[in-house]
A protein has these predicted regions:
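Juxtamembrane transmembrane-helix boundary signature
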Residues: 13-37, 245
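Short, small-residue-biased leader/transition segments that mark boundaries at the very start
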Residues: 4-6
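Hydrophobic mid-bilayer segments of alpha-helices in multi-pass membrane transport proteins
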Residues: 8-15, 163-171, 193-209, 236-244
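C-terminal transmembrane helix pair
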Residues: 71, 78-118, 123-153, 279-366
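Juxtamembrane interface elements at the cytosolic ends of transmembrane helices
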Residues: 27-31, 142-151, 200-221
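Membrane-interface helix termini and inter-helical loops of multi-pass transporters
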Residues: 1, 119-123, 180-190, 219-220, ...
Length: 366
């Protein structure tokens, strides 16, 4: 846990420093005003043009691009801004719950790390899980957002949301088409290159915008970095408790009991039980990203990277994000102890991702 905390300290200090430059220069406010027509439908309790809109957008964009190191600090910045609007400081608000479920559903465009692991394990086509994973994580996100919208009585059938869904669908279609036109080696190189270029561009753009607005960029960065240090210290107790809980769960044998129980029940119905071998990865991903990666690699070692179980474990790993880790860190950063229905909605997204991973894997690989 000390390694995780020390790693988070540097990352949070860097990115909250960059975000403070954007805040002081007015860039976040400008981004918030631009996003208001869409985000005010999903987050109706956030005032139009509030800085939280910009931070939420930056976080979700970083998540979709697989820029985890940038996404978490931006998400914690958004949580701090949402907490400023919170009349009950120990209770999660509706916008917080919607934001966290959008994070836990783990929508990502290109699962670069999963494809890298498949390549290392000797898969003939490491990228063959791309389209199934993209479909699965999209389903998880849609179900999660829908669950929160039903709980909060948000109407999703309005023009801005439908236009956004249409644009995302077109983008996904274009991405899938481009994906089919390049080799797996080129895809890995291009994905990493694009991610690094975007990361560098974001940092450079914030600094240049601050210089253009004639603010003291250095002082703004230092101020934000100090906030990052304070935030990292604040989340340590929550993070340690969470990591201890995961260790107990993994070593107690509870995972084996759950997986074997599911396999037994499915077997009684006469249905195919081959998917059960990938369930440890699917269940662990809600708790720990590194734990899920380890189980995914173990599954590929045991069954083979190109086996049905090996491929499904990869699809399941990319279906959603580490729900309990995200809830612990994000809520812990602002002192939220009453999470309301955040865990329930997050687990609904997780469960839908697991079901989708099973069905889609059977369609593509069985």
């Amino acid at each position: 846990s000390s390694d995780v905390c020390s790693s988070d300290l540097g990352i949070l200090s860097l990115w909250l420093g960059i975000m403070k430059i954007g805040e002081n220069s007015g860039m976040i406010n400008a981004l918030s005003r631009w996003l208001s027509p869409v985000f005010c439908r999903l987050f109706p309790e956030i005032p139009q043009g509030h800085p939280a809109m910009g931070s939420i957008f930056m976080n979700l964009s970083a998540n979709m691009l697989g820029l985890d190191n940038a996404a978490t600090p931006m998400g914690l910045k958004a949580m701090k801004e949402l907490q400023e609007l919170n009349p009950k400081k120990d209770t999660a608000t509706n916008p917080m719950i919607m934001f966290l479920v959008m994070n836990t559903s783990g929508l990502i465009l290109i699962p670069v790390s999963i494809m890298m692991y498949r390549s290392q394990m000797g898969a003939a086509q490491p990228t063959d899980i791309f389209i199934p994973t993209l479909i699965t994580t999209a389903i998880s996100t849609i179900v999660g957002v829908t669950a929160v919208s039903i709980a909060q009585r948000i109407n999703l059938l309005n023009k801005p949301i439908l236009i956004l869904i249409g644009c995302i669908s077109l983008f996904f279609s274009g991405l899938i088409y481009l994906f089919t036109q390049v080799s797996r080696e080129e895809m890995g190189v291009y994905s990493t290159l694009v991610a690094n270029i975007i990361l560098f561009t974001i940092i450079l753009l914030f600094i240049l915008w601050g210089l253009w607005k004639k603010i003291n960029v250095y002082d703004a960065f230092i101020e934000g970095a100090k906030e990052g240090f304070t935030t990292a210290i604040r989340i340590v107790p929550y993070l340690v408790a969470f990591l201890v809980g995961i260790a107990v769960f993994r070593t107690s044998g509870a995972m084996d009991i759950i997986v074997n129980g599911i396999g037994y029940i499915v077997g009684l119905s006469g249905a195919d039980t081959e998917f059960v071998g990938a369930l440890p990865t699917a269940l662990m991903k809600s708790l720990s990203g590194s734990g899920a990666n380890g189980l995914m690699i173990d599954t590929m070692k045991q069954y083979g990277a190109d086996s049905f179980v090996g491929r499904m474990s990869c699809v399941a790993r990319g279906a959603s994000d580490t729900t309990f880790y995200i809830l612990a860190v994000y809520f812990g950063s602002v002192g939220i102890t009453k999470t309301r229905n955040a865990v329930t909605c997050g687990l609904i997204a997780d469960f839908s991702g697991i079901i989708a991973a099973i069905i889609i894997s059977y369609i593509f690989f069985f």
